[in-house]
């Protein structure tokens, strides 16, 4: 019987050239090939898109309107498709409320655990809270000041959706006259219609009393009635005071601290029932940061030490500052750090109630006298940020503010009540501060009573199972409260992978995009085993991947190419990894078999005395690290995932240099001092973020070559006759562009319930320019024709214009010859965007004082692309510049001049320097995981060289 398979016929998405391919089902299939060869076009834009479209088509029209219309991919037929799930890197939630624990649903089970077996403790007296009797409630109320007016309320609905008409009617029938609905007292016969889609709180007014001697009996009767109505809950509305909450279940006998019935939503920071009231469950508050207000404490007040009050068009604040200094005898020519603590406090936090009189010049001319209390710079910024109606003012003030942990919950996000409940000696805020490996160990060994163990058994099983999956995909160093928005693409993808394994689905087609990104070689085996486990459940996995180990572990390998863009889009080779390795046409096969490889450099540039010295780096998990980064060579920072590489390079090195060199407002991670910055004049962070957020940005505009091309068109005879200047050939301004589409070339049609549809502009035919502009040609081509050329074609077309050719050649050098000059920035992959940025740096004149920082530049790159990238990076170093790279890829690590290896483990087990030196030095360091794998690679390369 024939093995089941997925049969694709006539795939033409993007650059695919009418591909026919048969893929075995229930196998681990890896698709590889050069960057831009068409891997994602086949895996995501054809196979996954059709699987998803067919599933959506099977739903009702009502459901489809919320999911959106899915276009049919450009393919003739696909047979044997299963329901498809895509696990890519673009769907990371940036919501500040989303954490590792919430995304993986572990937090839901932890909340349930605390609600079922949690023990509440009084935060004031640290004693377990027991249930309250009616007598205890009476005694507590009688402690209120005499003549205090109170209302006894029975909460019958607590923050639930619905119109609740039947309930209100029943309350009226029982003889109750008043209700408190969402904080407002209303007559039971006069209740407005409640919005059924909103949450409401309804409390019955059981009695209204004035606190005085002799009311105890009536009070006790009314409390019993209220408790009966609301299943053991009581709210006392103290007129002109705060509500008191009582429960038959929990309250402190000493101070009366009481807590409602334990339920899961009480432990949710996304619910008003559980969230900290100060920060609304975010754990952080935007607070004025004195270090941003006074960035350089060596400056005097006259030199502009207080940055937000540096003179602008109005001299209001400078005049006020001068007057304050006169009144309090503060020397304005003394460095800020040498002022007394009292003087600094007056400037920053105000002068109390003392009024100050001063005269200032108004913007429109003329002077004005003011008498006011000096509030201080910090309260002034805070007030203007929170109260100003001007968006511009709020934006300006926010530059001097930082997210700091909330003072009430200390960053734990939850209310005081929620944090008073303990399981196994920890509250829920403490548990989520654990890393995944620590949490797994804690829950496996948790100590519960026999009764609690019986209740918690099933919940613990779910928690342990999910933590185990996360541990198995190499994420043991992540803390449960880590914000999703701070995860790398690879981490977010592996979290989704672990969640999918937890669902234990079978018969599904999973399409993954480079799951090994950001993963150290040490953890690769665990990831591959996870993929095999998913396959063994009866699923088909299509993985777009360049990782050597993953390709070798595949059941079926597909090499797409042979080149990129127009030169790709074909199946070069497919079959088992062994079959592909024997195929001489397959570039991937040649690298896998060792016939081709990235060579170890014949010599390494020695580290000179010129260096950046970082002392006492303590950002995130760094443990007071001291490290030197040599200048004018290529340094690679290595270490297992979570060891502190990004903390050292991005948080400390980059942000501190950006602050000093670029006068950036970013706040670097903690460190004691950094020396050697004066040897640099430029810092460039070449990351994988888009080169532009709109379709108007493209490689030609980003690299600046489009300016030169427009100059060429403005110099043509036709342009001179017509009086066209350079601006005529821009699609961003009026004049030469098509006004029907405003130079976009496409028109957006809003479809309301369906997704917006983009269609080519009928007036300009998608060419972006008006007819008159397109009549101007250079060598037979108009400006729109130029934008449609690939970089390679344009390089030949402009070969006689050195200025243009030089810039275009840098794009070819970084492997982007296949990209069109006008390709929308939004359609470039992260790796392509990064290489466009590199190209734009390559054609600039070097001073030899620049430092380039790259974070995993090999993401999305084939070995052949990496070889090209390394040549480009070495060109930068040959100019005398410095390159610092965070990388796991051994081909990059082995070609480094100098390595800084962090670790030894991830998370709390990392944050120290394991070894520094050349790759050969690291390979001899037994305590280095990187060294272990590097040694194997260096020995294998040496062996291959000798064999030749």
From Swiss-Prot:
Binding site for ATP: 33-40, 639-646
Any one Gene Ontology BP term: SOS response
Domain of life: Bacteria
GO cellular component term of the entry, any: excinuclease repair complex
InterPro entries linked to this entry: ABC_transporter-like_ATP-bd (IPR003439), ABC_transporter-like_CS (IPR017871), P-loop_NTPase (IPR027417), UvrA (IPR004602), UvrA_DNA-bd (IPR041552), UvrA_inter (IPR041102)
HAMAP family: UvrA (MF_00205)
Function: The UvrABC repair system catalyzes the recognition and processing of DNA lesions. UvrA is an ATPase and a DNA-binding protein. A damage recognition complex composed of 2 UvrA and 2 UvrB subunits scans DNA for abnormalities. When the presence of a lesion has been verified by UvrB, the UvrA molecules dissociate.
Subunit record text: Forms a heterotetramer with UvrB during the search for lesions.
Family classification: Belongs to the ABC transporter superfamily. UvrA family.
Protein name listed in UniProt: UvrABC system protein A
Organism whose genome encodes this protein: Staphylococcus aureus (strain MRSA252)
């Amino acid at each position: 019987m024939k093995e089941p398979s997925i049969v694709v016929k006539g795939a033409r998405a993007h650059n695919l050239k009418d591909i026919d391919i048969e893929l075995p089902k229930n196998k681990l299939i890896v698709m590889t090939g050069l960057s831009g060869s068409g891997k994602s076009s086949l895996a995501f834009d054809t196979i996954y898109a059709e699987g998803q479209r067919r599933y959506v088509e099977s739903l009702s029209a009502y459901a489809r309107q919320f999911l959106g219309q899915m276009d049919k991919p450009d393919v003739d037929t696909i047979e044997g498709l299963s329901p498809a799930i895509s696990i890519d890197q673009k769907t990371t939630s940036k919501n500040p409320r989303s954490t590792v624990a919430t995304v993986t649903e572990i937090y839901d089970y932890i909340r349930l655990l605390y609600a079922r077996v949690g023990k509440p403790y009084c935060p004031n007296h640290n004693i377990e809270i027991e249930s309250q009797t009616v007598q205890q409630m009476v005694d507590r109320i009688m402690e209120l000041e005499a003549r205090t007016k109170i209302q006894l309320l029975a909460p019958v609905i607590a923050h639930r959706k619905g119109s609740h008409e039947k309930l209100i009617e029943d309350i009226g029938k029982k003889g109750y006259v008043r209700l408190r609905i969402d904080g407002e007292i209303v007559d039971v016969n006069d209740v407005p219609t409640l919005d059924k889609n909103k949450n409401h709180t309804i409390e019955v007014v059981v009695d209204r009393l004035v606190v005085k001697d002799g009311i105890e009996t009536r009070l006790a009767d009314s409390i019993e009635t209220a408790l009966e109505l609301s299943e053991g809950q009581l709210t006392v509305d103290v007129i002109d005071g705060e509500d008191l909450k009582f429960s038959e279940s929990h309250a402190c006998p000493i101070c009366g601290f009481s807590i409602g019935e334990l339920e899961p939503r009480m432990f949710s920071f996304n619910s008003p029932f559980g969230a900290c009231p100060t920060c609304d469950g975010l754990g952080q508050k935007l607070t004025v940061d004195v270090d941003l207000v006074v960035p350089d404490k060596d400056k005097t007040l006259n030199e502009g030490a207080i940055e937000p009050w540096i003179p602008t068009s109005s001299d209001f604040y400078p005049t006020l500052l001068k007057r304050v200094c006169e009144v309090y005898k503060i020397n304005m020519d003394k460095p800020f750090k040498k002022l007394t603590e009292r003087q600094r406090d007056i400037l920053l936090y105000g002068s109390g109630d003392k009024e100050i009189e001063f005269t200032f010049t108004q913007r429109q001319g003329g002077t004005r006298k003011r008498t006011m209390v000096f509030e201080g710079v910090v309260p002034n910024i805070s007030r203007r940020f929170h109260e100003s109606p001007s968006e511009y003012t709020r934006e300006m003030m926010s530059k001097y503010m930082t997210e700091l942990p909330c003072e009430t919950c200390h960053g734990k996000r939850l209310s005081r009540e929620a944090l008073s409940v303990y399981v196994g000696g920890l509250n829920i805020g403490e548990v989520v501060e654990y890393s995944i490996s620590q949490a797994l160990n804690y829950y496996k060994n948790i100590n519960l009573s026999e009764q609690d163990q019986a209740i918690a058994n099933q919940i613990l099983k779910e928690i342990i199972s999910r933590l185990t999956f996360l541990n198995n995909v190499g994420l043991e160093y992540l803390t449960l409260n880590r914000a999703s928005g701070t995860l790398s693409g690879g981490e977010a993808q592996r979290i989704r992978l672990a969640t999918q394994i937890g669902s234990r689905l079978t018969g599904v087609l999973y399409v993954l995009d480079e799951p090994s990104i950001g993963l150290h070689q040490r953890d690769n085996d665990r990831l591959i085993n996870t993929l095999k486990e998913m396959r063994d459940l009866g699923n088909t996995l299509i993985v777009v991947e360049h990782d050597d180990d993953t390709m070798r572990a595949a059941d079926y390998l597909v090499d797409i190419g042979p080149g990129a863009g127009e030169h790709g889009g074909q199946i070069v080779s497919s079959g088992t990894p062994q079959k592909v390795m024997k195929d001489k046409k397959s570039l991937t096969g040649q690298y896998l078999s060792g016939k081709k490889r990235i060579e170890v450099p014949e010599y390494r540039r020695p580290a000179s005395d010129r260096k950046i010295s970082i002392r006492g780096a303590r950002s995130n998990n760094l443990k007071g690290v001291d490290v030197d980064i040599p200048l004018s060579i290529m340094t690679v920072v290595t270490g297992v995932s979570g060891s502190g590489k990004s903390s050292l390079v991005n948080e400390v090195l980059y942000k501190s240099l950006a602050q000093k060199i670029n006068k950036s407002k970013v706040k670097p991670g903690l460190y004691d001092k950094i020396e050697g910055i004066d040897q640099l004049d430029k810092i460039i962070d070449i990351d994988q973020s888009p080169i532009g957020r709109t379709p108007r940005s493209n490689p030609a505009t980003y690299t600046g070559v489009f300016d030169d091309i427009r100059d060429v068109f403005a110099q043509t005879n036709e342009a001179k006759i017509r009086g066209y200047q350079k601006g005529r050939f821009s699609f961003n301004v009026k004049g030469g562009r098509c006004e029907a589409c405003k130079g976009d070339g496409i028109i957006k049609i809003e479809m309301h319930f369906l997704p917006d549809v983009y269609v080519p502009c009928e007036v300009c035919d998608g060419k972006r320019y008006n007819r008159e502009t397109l009549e101007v040609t250079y060598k037979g081509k108009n400006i729109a024709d130029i934008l449609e050329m690939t970089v390679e074609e344009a390089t030949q077309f402009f070969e006689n214009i050195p200025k243009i050719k030089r810039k275009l050649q840098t794009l070819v050098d970084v492997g982007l010859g296949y990209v069109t000059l006008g390709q929308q920035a939004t359609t470039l992959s992260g790796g392509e965007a990064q290489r466009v940025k590199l190209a734009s740096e390559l054609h600039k004149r070097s001073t030899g004082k620049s430092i380039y920082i790259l974070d995993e530049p090999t993401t999305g790159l084939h070995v052949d692309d990496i070889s090209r990238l390394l040549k480009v990076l070495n060109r930068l170093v040959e100019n005398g510049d410095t390159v610092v790279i965070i990388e796991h890829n051994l081909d990059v690590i082995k070609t480094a001049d100098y390595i800084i290896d962090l670790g030894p483990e991830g998370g709390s087990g990392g944050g120290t320097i394991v070894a520094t030196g050349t790759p050969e030095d690291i390979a001899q360091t037994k305590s280095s995981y990187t060294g272990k794998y590097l040694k194997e690679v260096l020995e294998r390369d040496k062996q291959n060289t000798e064999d030749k």
